[in-house]
Amino acid sequence: MDSQGRKVVVCDNGTGFVKCGYAGSNFPEHIFPALVGRPIIRSTTKVGNIEIKDLMVGDEASELRSMLEVNYPMENGIVRNWDDMKHLWDYTFGPEKLNIDTRNCKILLTEPPMNPTKNREKIVEVMFETYQFSGVYVAIQAVLTLYAQGLLTGVVVDSGDGVTHICPVYEGFSLPHLTRRLDIAGRDITRYLIKLLLLRGYAFNHSADFETVRMIKEKLCYVGYNIEQEQKLALETTVLVESYTLPDGRIIKVGGERFEAPEALFQPHLINVEGVGVAELLFNTIQAADIDTRSEFYKHIVLSGGSTMYPGLPSRLERELKQLYLERVLKGDVEKLSKFKIRIEDPPRRKHMVFLGGAVLADIMKDKDNFWMTRQEYQEKGVRVLEKLGVTVR
């Protein structure tokens, strides 16, 4: 609460999950899938203790997904369906989750770097007009990740469900001219895993199966350190094969797919996306930075988001960065490589890093009125109130 007794809410709306809670807390109060479902066949039945309604959101929608047509309101970190997004926010602020009187609260929201201005304007409009929050702030996710890590300078590799960003931050300011975006993230890897399992002869078709495969991915996938070796193992042995029991009781076997799916992060051509993978993108970003800041950036690479949780990802990233540095900067001079210092931080709670940083920032700022955009300012200026964030509104 701030000095006037208003609650300060932090809401990290991810493409895949909503993480919400209060300023100063060190864990989100609620984490639930960002999905909205409508029944395929209208019926008034109950499933277990959940009643099927015309509109199901979050956890309930996820549990009953086999009977629903499921929609994700966000794609690649951008809101695509505002009506469904409002249903998601109603659920977040309503009795199911936070149960707050929004008129008497301030809210800190997060957004990916390089997000379209129109998207941000609309979010602010909805927060003030529909929910009538007394104050709103929108923070860039990568900056919050560094705050949570206690840093002001570093490069954040943030890979969630909808989008992967490489975002250098210097002295607490994100550097948009160096920020790189890769439209491959958790959801694409799940899609690719479905395709690989189809090739093995397992059929997944309904939107409900998507959630099932996501769970398989989270349980079994990893990033291979040496792809040639992994492929050899997959072809010649069965050491990689694991069994997984599906919700309907069937058992499937997953082998080489375990490392082949996340490989798309490093080799986008596997899923027909043009461009370089996450390691080369990170290398290019740091090399494009000012020569004086490069070594700082190499020493403070911070992983964030659920799609950086694969076992083996930090070591593979480090291996590829060293290889690229050796080839392109040192021109193959191995002797000099020992002077190249690199550190990749992979905090165990990186799934919720953005929320944690938001909770820290909101707590520090809760009584600083010049920090928040207020409802009164919005009524006077409309979306031009965003100038307060240091974001020019065109």
Swiss-Prot record:
It is found in: Cytoplasm, Cytoskeleton; Cell projection; Nucleus. It holds the Pfam family Actin. It comes from the Eukaryota. ATP-binding component of the Arp2/3 complex, a multiprotein complex that mediates actin polymerization upon stimulation by nucleation-promoting factor (NPF). The Arp2/3 complex mediates the formation of branched actin networks in the cytoplasm, providing the force for cell motility. Seems to contact the pointed end of the daughter actin filament. In podocytes, required for the formation of lamellipodia downstream of AVIL and PLCE1 regulation. PANTHER family: ACTIN. Component of the Arp2/3 complex composed of ACTR2/ARP2, ACTR3/ARP3, ARPC1B/p41-ARC, ARPC2/p34-ARC, ARPC3/p21-ARC, ARPC4/p20-ARC and ARPC5/p16-ARC. Interacts with AVIL. Belongs to the actin family. ARP2 subfamily. This is Actin-related protein 2. It comes from Bos taurus (Bovine).
